[in-house]
């Protein structure tokens, strides 16, 4: 290992010491040791006149990350240099500035590596070049720090050549694009797109024989004269340039021409140079796997005369449903297309209604178009020889953590693109057909934002210097991009966290429905919140990226010195961007904040007055409430006292009654009672005699009545006066008898008591 550059503090972050790590010194030495002709290529034509531009340089990506480690490909040593970004460092351990591991290839590749790609299972790394491909198997980890083979300085790694005989025998063929099959459950498979317009799928178990082959050329173009046929199709832009897999979906059995059931497969989107996109479905779940029929070209809406460009170079499928395709062109245009099911009225469906697969061809709806600033556009005269637009191939890269962000790398630098409208699109697609609010929110949503991270061609006379690679490191304070320049300088730039997903909730947290949510948080999450308003004001349409000082490690500063006029233009451009995109927007945000603060102060004063009034009302309310409660308590006590008083009175009556009952001398009332009782028998005898008299009179009258009613005797006819007299006499006698009976009953009851 190399010696340490300097001591490292315990509390320092990796962002501060990583650019000074010894691995970059080693890689820069490897660049200096290259052949002079190879090293002078990037420095050619650096004079101020700049008569011509060199051909496009290959865009490399020789960096990837795994966990807390950074892997850098050393082309000179055919090895990976592994740096731990968050490794433990205790006492007596060598400082991290000189500590790294070297993963050496046992069978090094014989071709130049342009890209390294980690497999979905994270056990293999694809070493991709234009003339071949190899798969490097990562060694095992063990030890307390979980390092490769316990932390050895150099570790041998086995490599698997992919399609070695094919590339050796076909010298005219080149590898255009390569990607891993996205399944983590199967054995690793890698997908290759070659210049003969054929996609081949290889398994690491049988790396020389393709498992599946997808021929993209038409039947009439497949002739014995392959070179002439390929040149003809390439001139028309009918060759595939890139592909990408989408998320796993369930595909109808008609696509695979099966009769039993539907198949679970990955959609494979294939981009042609003329801008057309084709679709097929790949399923390797069951051996030997299934390949769907090639569908397309997919119709694009709204239609464009130029089919959205004839210089397409890259395609990327964002991992969301519905799928969102990003199509890049060499002129710097990015098209964000939503993949939706085709309409029944589609012309293509009507023309191919005889084909059952035509019903399954989706459509691409171009949601927005974005133009990247590949090279800085400086204010210049009309007769500027560099007025023509700069163009170069663009590579699209997924963000390892954020599904709504992706990155673009090209010869002139690096861009980062974030899509803020994906969640609004999901809301709109998940809403009812009559729900227009979600559609209005989707149309009102701000477009994607573009960050110009790095510019390697700040001046027109500068030659492009494509980066060696980059990687996104997630952090608690936001994502950070690590860029490795062509001279192996390490640049660390933080990314905007606007589209960065929120941290998931902890397992120990439980939602409590009774706990009310903070009104400030509710206000901040509303679509019209002040925070989002300030963010919209501060949203920049342009930025000043990081500039590279030198484009080549072997070129002198005198050769690379730009003309003073272009330096002035560059400074003017940077000043204008700072003025318009930073200072002016910050002044506007400041005015809005001051206006908001004034309004909030007025609201605060009014709320304080209302608060004082509420406090007074609360005090009076509490006083009235206390009086009411006191009155209720007194009423309860009064009722209890009244009940106790009645109870005591009843007890006193009983006591007095028992007391009088035990006296030896009769009281006045008792004596009166005694006299009344003594008079009762006489009254009873008198009443008895009266009853006997009445009874005798009744019997007498009864006998008289019988005699009167007897038929032997003549009927006695009474006059009206006589009847009236008799009725009055009987009435008086009846009342007299009734009174006597009542008196007798009263006396009887009294005596019984």
UniProtKB/Swiss-Prot annotation:
GO molecular function terms attached to this record: structural constituent of nuclear pore
Any coiled-coil regions, as ranges: 623-663
Function: Component of nuclear pore complex.
Organism of this sequence: Mus musculus
InterPro entries assigned: Nucleoporin_Nup88, NUP88/NUP82
Predominant localisation class: nucleus
Keywords: Acetylation, Coiled coil, mRNA transport, Nuclear pore complex, Nucleus, Phosphoprotein, Protein transport, Translocation, Transport
Pfam families assigned to the protein according to its UniProt record, in alphabetical order: Nup88 (PF10168)
Ranges annotated as spanning the membrane: none
Phosphothreonine found at: 526
Lineage: Eukaryota, Metazoa, Chordata, Craniata, Vertebrata
Subcellular localization, as worded in the UniProt entry: Nucleus, Nuclear pore complex
Stated name of the protein: Nuclear pore complex protein Nup88
Superkingdom, taxonomy of origin: Eukaryota
């Amino acid at each position: 290992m190399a010696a340490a550059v300097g001591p490292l503090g315990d509390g320092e972050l990796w962002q501060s010491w990583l650019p000074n790590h010894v691995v970059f010194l080693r890689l820069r030495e490897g660049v200096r040791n290259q052949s002079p002709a190879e090293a002078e290529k990037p420095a050619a034509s650096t004079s101020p006149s700049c008569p011509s531009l060199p051909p496009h340089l290959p865009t490399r990506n020789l960096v990837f990350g795994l966990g807390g480690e950074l892997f850098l490909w050393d082309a000179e040593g055919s090895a990976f240099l592994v740096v731990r970004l968050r490794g433990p460092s205790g006492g007596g351990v060598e400082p991290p500035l000189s500590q790294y591991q070297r993963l050496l290839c046992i069978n090094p590749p014989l071709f130049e590596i342009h890209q390294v790609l980690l497999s979905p299972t994270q056990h293999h790394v694809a070493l991709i070049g234009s003339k071949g491909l190899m798969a490097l198997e990562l060694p095992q980890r063990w030890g307390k720090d979980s390092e490769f083979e316990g932390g050895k300085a150099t570790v041998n790694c086995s490599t698997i050549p992919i399609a070695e005989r094919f590339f050796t025998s076909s010298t005219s063929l080149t590898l255009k694009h390569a990607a891993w099959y996205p399944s983590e459950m199967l054995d690793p498979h890698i997908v290759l797109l070659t210049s003969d317009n054929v996609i081949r799928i290889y398994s690491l178990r049988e790396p020389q024989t393709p498992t599946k082959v997808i021929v993209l050329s038409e039947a009439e173009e497949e002739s014995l004269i392959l070179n002439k046929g390929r040149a003809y199709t390439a001139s028309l832009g009918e060759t595939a340039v890139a592909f990408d897999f989408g998320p796993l979906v369930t595909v109808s059995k008609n696509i695979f021409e099966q009769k039993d059931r539907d198949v679970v497969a990955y959609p494979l989107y294939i981009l042609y140079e003329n801008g057309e996109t084709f679709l097929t479905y790949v399923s390797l779940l069951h051996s030997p796997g299934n390949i769907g029929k090639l569908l397309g070209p997919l119709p694009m809406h709204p239609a464009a005369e130029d089919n959205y460009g004839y210089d397409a170079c890259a395609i990327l499928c964002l991992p969301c449903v519905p799928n969102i395709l990003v199509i890049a062109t060499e002129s710097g245009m990015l098209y964000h297309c939503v993949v939706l099911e085709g309409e029944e009225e589609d012309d293509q469906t009507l023309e191919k209604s005889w084909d059952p697969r035509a019903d399954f061809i989706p459509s691409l709806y171009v949601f927005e178009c974005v133009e990247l600033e590949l090279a800085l556009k400086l204010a210049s005269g009309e007769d500027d020889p560099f007025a023509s637009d700069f163009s170069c191939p663009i590579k699209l890269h997924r963000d390892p953590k954020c599904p709504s962000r992706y990155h673009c790398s090209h010869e002139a630098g690096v861009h980062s693109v974030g899509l803020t409208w994906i969640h609004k699109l999901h809301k709109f697609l998940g809403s009812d057909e009559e729900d227009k609010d979600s559609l209005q929110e989707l149309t009102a949503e701000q477009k994607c934002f573009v960050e110009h991270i790095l510019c390697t061609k700040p001046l027109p006379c500068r030659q492009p210097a494509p980066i060696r690679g980059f990687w996104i490191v997630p952090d608690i304070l936001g994502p950070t991009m690590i860029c490795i320049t062509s001279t192996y300088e390490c640049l660390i730039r933080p990314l905007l966290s606007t589209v960065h997903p929120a941290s998931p909730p902890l397992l120990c947290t439980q939602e409590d429905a009774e706990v009310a949510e903070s009104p400030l948080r509710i206000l901040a999450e509303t679509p019209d919140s002040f925070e989002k308003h300030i963010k919209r004001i501060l949203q920049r349409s342009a930025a000043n990226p990081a500039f590279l000082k030198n484009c080549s490690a072997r070129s002198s500063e005198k050769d690379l010195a730009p003309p003073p006029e272009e330096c002035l233009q560059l400074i003017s451009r940077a000043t204008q961007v700072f003025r318009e995109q930073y200072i002016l927007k910050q002044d506007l945000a400041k005015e809005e904040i001051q206006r908001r603060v004034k309004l909030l102060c007025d609201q605060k004063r009014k709320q304080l007055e209302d608060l004082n009034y509420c406090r007074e009302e609360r005090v009076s309310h509490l006083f009235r409430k206390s009086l009411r409660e006191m009155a209720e308590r007194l009423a309860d006590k009064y009722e209890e006292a009244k009940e106790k008083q009645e109870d005591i009175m009843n007890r006193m009556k009983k006591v007095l009654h028992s007391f009088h009952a035990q006296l030896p001398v009769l009281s006045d009332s008792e004596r009166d009672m005694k006299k009344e009782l003594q008079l009762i028998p006489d009254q009873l005898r008198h009443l008895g005699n009266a009853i006997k008299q009445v009874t005798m009179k009744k019997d007498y009258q009864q006998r008289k009545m019988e005699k009167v009613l007897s038929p032997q005797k003549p009927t006695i006819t009474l006059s009206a006066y006589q009847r009236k007299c008799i009725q009055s006499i009987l009435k008086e006698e009846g009342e007299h008898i009734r009174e006597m009976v009542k008196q007798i009953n009263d006396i009887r009851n009294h005596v019984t008591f």
